[in-house]
Protein backbone atom coordinates (compact mmCIF):
# COMPACT_ATOMS: atom_id res chain seq x y z
CA UNK A 1 0.00 0.00 0.00
CA UNK A 2 2.78 2.41 0.97
CA UNK A 3 4.61 1.58 -2.25
CA UNK A 4 1.50 2.37 -4.32
CA UNK A 5 1.09 5.72 -2.58
CA UNK A 6 4.75 6.51 -3.29
CA UNK A 7 4.39 5.88 -7.03
CA UNK A 8 1.17 7.93 -7.18
CA UNK A 9 2.95 10.86 -5.53
CA UNK A 10 5.88 10.62 -7.96
CA UNK A 11 3.47 10.57 -10.91
CA UNK A 12 1.55 13.57 -9.60
CA UNK A 13 4.74 15.56 -9.08
CA UNK A 14 5.86 14.80 -12.65
CA UNK A 15 2.50 15.87 -14.08
CA UNK A 16 2.52 19.03 -11.98
CA UNK A 17 5.99 19.93 -13.23
CA UNK A 18 4.96 19.32 -16.83
CA UNK A 19 1.77 21.40 -16.50
CA UNK A 20 3.76 24.18 -14.90
CA UNK A 21 6.04 24.37 -17.90
CA UNK A 22 3.08 24.42 -20.27
CA UNK A 23 1.54 27.32 -18.37
CA UNK A 24 4.69 29.45 -18.51
CA UNK A 25 7.57 27.82 -20.38
CA UNK A 26 9.55 31.06 -20.57
CA UNK A 27 10.30 30.96 -16.85
CA UNK A 28 12.60 27.96 -17.32
CA UNK A 29 16.21 27.88 -18.38
CA UNK A 30 17.10 25.90 -21.50
CA UNK A 31 20.81 26.63 -21.87
CA UNK A 32 23.39 25.83 -19.20
CA UNK A 33 27.16 26.01 -19.04
CA UNK A 34 29.43 23.91 -16.84
CA UNK A 35 33.00 25.07 -16.27
CA UNK A 36 35.60 23.85 -13.80
CA UNK A 37 36.96 27.38 -13.40
CA UNK A 38 33.65 28.81 -12.21
CA UNK A 39 32.96 30.81 -15.38
CA UNK A 40 29.75 28.90 -16.12
CA UNK A 41 26.49 28.28 -14.33
CA UNK A 42 27.89 25.28 -12.48
CA UNK A 43 31.20 23.62 -11.74
CA UNK A 44 29.77 20.10 -11.79
CA UNK A 45 27.76 18.37 -14.51
CA UNK A 46 25.43 16.63 -12.08
CA UNK A 47 24.51 19.98 -10.49
CA UNK A 48 23.45 21.24 -13.92
CA UNK A 49 21.40 18.10 -14.55
CA UNK A 50 19.67 18.47 -11.20
CA UNK A 51 18.72 22.05 -12.12
CA UNK A 52 17.06 21.05 -15.40
CA UNK A 53 13.29 20.96 -15.71
CA UNK A 54 11.79 17.58 -16.47
CA UNK A 55 9.95 16.84 -19.73
CA UNK A 56 10.93 20.22 -21.26
CA UNK A 57 8.97 21.81 -24.11
CA UNK A 58 12.20 22.54 -25.99
CA UNK A 59 15.59 20.83 -26.03
CA UNK A 60 17.91 21.71 -23.16
CA UNK A 61 21.53 22.33 -24.10
CA UNK A 62 24.37 21.85 -21.65
CA UNK A 63 27.67 23.32 -22.83
CA UNK A 64 30.57 21.67 -21.04
CA UNK A 65 33.85 23.56 -21.10
CA UNK A 66 37.21 21.83 -21.30
CA UNK A 67 38.19 20.12 -18.08
CA UNK A 68 38.41 16.78 -16.31
CA UNK A 69 35.09 16.25 -14.52
CA UNK A 70 35.77 13.58 -11.94
CA UNK A 71 32.18 12.69 -11.12
CA UNK A 72 29.61 9.94 -11.52
CA UNK A 73 26.62 11.36 -13.37
CA UNK A 74 23.08 10.24 -14.08
CA UNK A 75 20.53 11.77 -16.45
CA UNK A 76 17.16 10.36 -15.27
CA UNK A 77 14.40 9.19 -17.59
CA UNK A 78 12.30 12.32 -17.00
CA UNK A 79 15.13 14.54 -18.27
CA UNK A 80 14.29 14.14 -21.95
CA UNK A 81 15.59 16.13 -24.93
CA UNK A 82 18.94 17.04 -23.37
CA UNK A 83 22.08 17.83 -25.36
CA UNK A 84 25.60 17.67 -23.94
CA UNK A 85 28.02 19.70 -26.09
CA UNK A 86 31.68 19.53 -25.12
CA UNK A 87 34.20 22.19 -26.01
CA UNK A 88 36.58 19.55 -27.43
CA UNK A 89 36.55 15.77 -27.32
CA UNK A 90 40.18 15.49 -26.17
CA UNK A 91 39.82 17.92 -23.27
CA UNK A 92 36.20 17.60 -22.16
CA UNK A 93 36.39 14.48 -20.03
CA UNK A 94 33.84 12.89 -17.70
CA UNK A 95 35.59 10.23 -15.65
CA UNK A 96 35.15 8.01 -12.61
CA UNK A 97 36.64 4.74 -11.34
CA UNK A 98 33.88 2.50 -9.97
CA UNK A 99 33.85 -1.20 -10.82
CA UNK A 100 31.89 -4.33 -10.03
CA UNK A 101 32.93 -5.56 -6.61
CA UNK A 102 33.94 -2.17 -5.29
CA UNK A 103 31.79 -1.84 -2.22
CA UNK A 104 28.27 -2.86 -3.20
CA UNK A 105 28.71 -2.03 -6.87
CA UNK A 106 27.64 -4.49 -9.56
CA UNK A 107 28.34 -4.31 -13.28
CA UNK A 108 25.24 -2.18 -13.77
CA UNK A 109 26.08 0.40 -11.11
CA UNK A 110 29.76 0.72 -12.00
CA UNK A 111 29.11 3.34 -14.72
CA UNK A 112 30.72 6.74 -15.00
CA UNK A 113 27.68 8.11 -16.87
CA UNK A 114 24.14 6.74 -16.98
CA UNK A 115 21.89 8.24 -19.64
CA UNK A 116 18.17 7.41 -19.41
CA UNK A 117 16.45 10.50 -20.84
CA UNK A 118 15.10 9.85 -24.33
CA UNK A 119 16.28 11.83 -27.35
CA UNK A 120 19.65 12.53 -25.76
CA UNK A 121 22.49 14.00 -27.82
CA UNK A 122 26.19 14.15 -26.94
CA UNK A 123 28.96 15.69 -29.00
CA UNK A 124 32.68 16.23 -28.39
CA UNK A 125 32.84 14.47 -25.01
CA UNK A 126 35.06 11.76 -23.54
CA UNK A 127 33.40 9.25 -21.20
CA UNK A 128 36.02 7.31 -19.23
CA UNK A 129 36.22 4.68 -16.54
CA UNK A 130 39.71 4.63 -15.06
CA UNK A 131 39.27 1.63 -12.74
CA UNK A 132 41.70 -0.34 -14.89
CA UNK A 133 41.64 -4.10 -15.65
CA UNK A 134 39.77 -5.07 -12.47
CA UNK A 135 36.64 -6.57 -14.01
CA UNK A 136 33.42 -4.97 -15.21
CA UNK A 137 33.68 -1.18 -15.17
CA UNK A 138 31.32 0.81 -17.39
CA UNK A 139 32.18 4.15 -18.92
CA UNK A 140 28.65 4.51 -20.30
CA UNK A 141 25.30 2.98 -19.40
CA UNK A 142 22.72 4.20 -21.89
CA UNK A 143 19.13 2.97 -21.86
CA UNK A 144 17.69 6.10 -23.48
CA UNK A 145 15.74 5.68 -26.71
CA UNK A 146 16.78 7.75 -29.73
CA UNK A 147 20.16 8.66 -28.26
CA UNK A 148 22.91 10.01 -30.52
CA UNK A 149 26.62 10.25 -29.73
CA UNK A 150 28.76 12.14 -32.24
CA UNK A 151 32.53 12.60 -32.12
CA UNK A 152 32.77 11.14 -28.61
CA UNK A 153 35.31 8.87 -26.95
CA UNK A 154 34.59 5.94 -24.63
CA UNK A 155 37.58 4.74 -22.62
CA UNK A 156 37.70 1.67 -20.43
CA UNK A 157 38.46 -2.02 -20.22
CA UNK A 158 35.83 -4.71 -19.63
CA UNK A 159 32.24 -3.69 -20.45
CA UNK A 160 33.05 -0.14 -21.57
CA UNK A 161 29.61 0.52 -23.10
CA UNK A 162 26.36 -1.01 -21.89
CA UNK A 163 23.84 -0.36 -24.67
CA UNK A 164 20.79 -1.06 -22.56
CA UNK A 165 17.04 -0.84 -22.98
CA UNK A 166 15.35 -3.74 -24.74
CA UNK A 167 13.39 -1.35 -26.96
CA UNK A 168 15.96 1.44 -27.04
CA UNK A 169 17.72 2.70 -30.17
CA UNK A 170 21.11 4.37 -30.10
CA UNK A 171 23.46 5.78 -32.71
CA UNK A 172 27.21 6.34 -32.41
CA UNK A 173 28.83 8.34 -35.21
CA UNK A 174 32.53 9.07 -35.68
CA UNK A 175 33.29 7.87 -32.16
CA UNK A 176 36.30 6.16 -30.59
CA UNK A 177 35.67 3.13 -28.37
CA UNK A 178 38.20 0.97 -26.55
CA UNK A 179 38.14 -1.94 -24.16
CA UNK A 180 38.91 -5.55 -23.45
CA UNK A 181 36.28 -8.23 -22.81
CA UNK A 182 32.74 -7.73 -24.17
CA UNK A 183 33.35 -4.00 -24.22
CA UNK A 184 30.21 -3.30 -26.28
CA UNK A 185 27.32 -5.25 -24.78
CA UNK A 186 23.61 -5.13 -24.11
CA UNK A 187 20.10 -5.64 -25.54
CA UNK A 188 19.47 -2.40 -27.44
CA UNK A 189 19.45 -1.76 -31.17
CA UNK A 190 22.67 0.22 -31.61
CA UNK A 191 24.42 1.39 -34.76
CA UNK A 192 28.10 2.32 -34.84
CA UNK A 193 28.82 4.35 -37.96
CA UNK A 194 32.33 5.31 -39.06
CA UNK A 195 33.70 4.61 -35.59
CA UNK A 196 37.17 3.50 -34.53
CA UNK A 197 37.10 0.54 -32.16
CA UNK A 198 40.25 -0.60 -30.36
CA UNK A 199 40.71 -3.96 -28.66
CA UNK A 200 43.31 -3.80 -25.89
CA UNK A 201 43.59 -7.54 -25.16
CA UNK A 202 42.70 -10.99 -26.48
CA UNK A 203 38.97 -10.81 -26.09
CA UNK A 204 35.52 -10.35 -27.60
CA UNK A 205 34.43 -7.03 -29.08
CA UNK A 206 30.69 -7.51 -28.61
CA UNK A 207 28.30 -9.42 -26.39
CA UNK A 208 24.81 -8.67 -27.66
CA UNK A 209 21.75 -9.59 -25.64
CA UNK A 210 19.20 -8.96 -28.38
CA UNK A 211 15.57 -9.46 -27.42
CA UNK A 212 13.66 -12.28 -29.08
CA UNK A 213 11.76 -11.04 -32.12
CA UNK A 214 14.00 -8.06 -32.90
CA UNK A 215 15.50 -8.05 -36.38
CA UNK A 216 18.55 -5.96 -35.48
CA UNK A 217 20.91 -5.77 -32.52
CA UNK A 218 24.37 -4.23 -32.97
CA UNK A 219 25.31 -2.99 -36.43
CA UNK A 220 28.75 -1.68 -37.36
CA UNK A 221 28.83 0.35 -40.57
CA UNK A 222 32.11 1.44 -42.19
CA UNK A 223 34.08 1.15 -38.94
CA UNK A 224 37.78 0.58 -38.33
CA UNK A 225 38.69 -2.14 -35.85
CA UNK A 226 42.13 -1.87 -34.27
CA UNK A 227 44.04 -4.28 -32.05
CA UNK A 228 47.02 -3.60 -29.82
CA UNK A 229 50.27 -5.25 -30.90
CA UNK A 230 50.02 -7.93 -28.20
CA UNK A 231 46.52 -8.96 -29.30
CA UNK A 232 46.52 -12.17 -31.36
CA UNK A 233 43.12 -13.71 -30.64
CA UNK A 234 40.18 -11.40 -31.11
CA UNK A 235 36.56 -12.37 -31.76
CA UNK A 236 33.96 -10.13 -33.36
CA UNK A 237 31.44 -11.24 -30.79
CA UNK A 238 29.80 -13.86 -28.64
CA UNK A 239 26.13 -14.17 -27.61
CA UNK A 240 25.35 -12.96 -24.12
CA UNK A 241 21.88 -14.39 -24.70
CA UNK A 242 20.62 -16.89 -27.26
CA UNK A 243 19.17 -14.46 -29.83
CA UNK A 244 22.13 -12.11 -30.08
CA UNK A 245 22.33 -10.21 -33.39
CA UNK A 246 25.45 -8.43 -34.61
CA UNK A 247 26.62 -7.37 -38.08
CA UNK A 248 29.88 -5.89 -39.35
CA UNK A 249 29.44 -4.21 -42.73
CA UNK A 250 32.26 -2.69 -44.81
CA UNK A 251 34.58 -2.60 -41.81
CA UNK A 252 38.37 -2.74 -41.64
CA UNK A 253 39.35 -5.82 -39.61
CA UNK A 254 42.82 -6.42 -38.13
CA UNK A 255 44.98 -9.51 -38.37
CA UNK A 256 44.11 -10.38 -34.76
CA UNK A 257 40.59 -11.47 -35.74
CA UNK A 258 40.52 -15.27 -35.42
CA UNK A 259 39.64 -17.18 -38.62
CA UNK A 260 36.29 -18.39 -37.24
CA UNK A 261 35.36 -14.81 -36.35
CA UNK A 262 32.65 -15.61 -33.82
CA UNK A 263 32.33 -17.55 -30.55
CA UNK A 264 29.30 -19.48 -29.25
CA UNK A 265 30.09 -18.71 -25.58
CA UNK A 266 30.68 -22.40 -24.93
CA UNK A 267 27.13 -23.38 -25.85
CA UNK A 268 26.49 -25.05 -29.25
CA UNK A 269 22.77 -24.30 -28.85
CA UNK A 270 23.54 -20.61 -29.35
CA UNK A 271 24.64 -21.43 -32.89
CA UNK A 272 21.01 -22.19 -33.75
CA UNK A 273 19.63 -18.86 -32.54
CA UNK A 274 22.33 -16.18 -32.71
CA UNK A 275 22.56 -14.14 -35.91
CA UNK A 276 26.06 -13.00 -36.79
CA UNK A 277 26.64 -11.42 -40.19
CA UNK A 278 29.29 -9.73 -42.31
CA UNK A 279 29.44 -7.95 -45.65
CA UNK A 280 32.41 -6.72 -47.67
CA UNK A 281 34.76 -6.29 -44.75
CA UNK A 282 38.41 -5.72 -45.62
CA UNK A 283 41.82 -6.06 -44.02
CA UNK A 284 43.86 -9.02 -42.80
CA UNK A 285 41.08 -10.24 -40.53
CA UNK A 286 38.34 -10.13 -43.15
CA UNK A 287 38.96 -13.49 -44.83
CA UNK A 288 35.74 -15.48 -44.44
CA UNK A 289 37.07 -18.80 -45.74
CA UNK A 290 37.26 -20.32 -42.27
CA UNK A 291 34.43 -18.37 -40.62
CA UNK A 292 32.14 -20.23 -38.23
CA UNK A 293 29.69 -22.27 -40.31
CA UNK A 294 26.74 -20.82 -38.41
CA UNK A 295 27.71 -17.20 -39.22
CA UNK A 296 26.12 -15.37 -42.15
CA UNK A 297 27.67 -13.70 -45.18
CA UNK A 298 25.15 -11.16 -46.41
CA UNK A 299 24.25 -10.79 -50.07
CA UNK A 300 24.04 -7.47 -51.91
CA UNK A 301 20.26 -7.73 -51.70
CA UNK A 302 20.21 -8.49 -47.98
CA UNK A 303 22.55 -5.64 -47.07
CA UNK A 304 20.07 -3.14 -48.52
CA UNK A 305 18.06 -3.61 -45.32
CA UNK A 306 20.95 -2.22 -43.28
CA UNK A 307 19.97 1.45 -43.50
CA UNK A 308 19.33 3.58 -40.44
CA UNK A 309 15.66 3.88 -41.37
CA UNK A 310 15.18 0.12 -41.61
CA UNK A 311 17.33 -0.77 -38.62
CA UNK A 312 15.66 1.67 -36.27
CA UNK A 313 12.16 0.66 -37.40
CA UNK A 314 13.04 -3.01 -36.76
CA UNK A 315 12.54 -3.81 -40.42
CA UNK A 316 8.97 -2.49 -40.48
CA UNK A 317 7.36 -1.72 -43.81
CA UNK A 318 6.63 1.81 -42.58
CA UNK A 319 10.04 3.42 -42.03
CA UNK A 320 10.94 5.06 -38.75
CA UNK A 321 10.62 8.85 -38.63
CA UNK A 322 14.31 9.57 -38.79
CA UNK A 323 14.40 13.18 -37.61
CA UNK A 324 16.23 12.15 -34.46
CA UNK A 325 19.14 10.52 -36.27
CA UNK A 326 19.19 12.68 -39.40
CA UNK A 327 20.41 15.59 -37.30
CA UNK A 328 23.92 14.17 -37.74
CA UNK A 329 23.71 15.10 -41.42
CA UNK A 330 23.43 18.75 -40.51
CA UNK A 331 26.28 20.99 -39.46
CA UNK A 332 27.69 20.14 -36.06
CA UNK A 333 26.67 22.17 -33.06
CA UNK A 334 28.72 25.32 -32.80
CA UNK A 335 30.37 26.21 -29.54
CA UNK A 336 29.17 29.74 -28.65
CA UNK A 337 31.84 32.42 -28.99
CA UNK A 338 30.94 33.66 -25.55
CA UNK A 339 29.26 31.47 -22.98
CA UNK A 340 28.43 33.74 -20.11
CA UNK A 341 26.95 32.92 -16.77
CA UNK A 342 23.23 33.65 -16.92
PLM features: residue spans?
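Bacterial Sec-dependent N-terminal signal peptides
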Residues: 1-25
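Sequence-level preference for short, compositionally simple segments enriched
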Residues: 22-342
Amino acid sequence: MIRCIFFVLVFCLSVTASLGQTANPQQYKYVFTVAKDGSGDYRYIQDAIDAMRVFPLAPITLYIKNGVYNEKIELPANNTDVRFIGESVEKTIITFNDYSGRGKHTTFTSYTAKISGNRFVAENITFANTAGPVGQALALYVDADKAVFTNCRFLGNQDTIYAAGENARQLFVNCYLEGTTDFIFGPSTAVFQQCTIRAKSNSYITAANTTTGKKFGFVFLDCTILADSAVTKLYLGRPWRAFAKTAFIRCQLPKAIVPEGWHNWGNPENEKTAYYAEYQNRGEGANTKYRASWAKQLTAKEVKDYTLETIFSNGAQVPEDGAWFRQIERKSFQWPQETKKQ
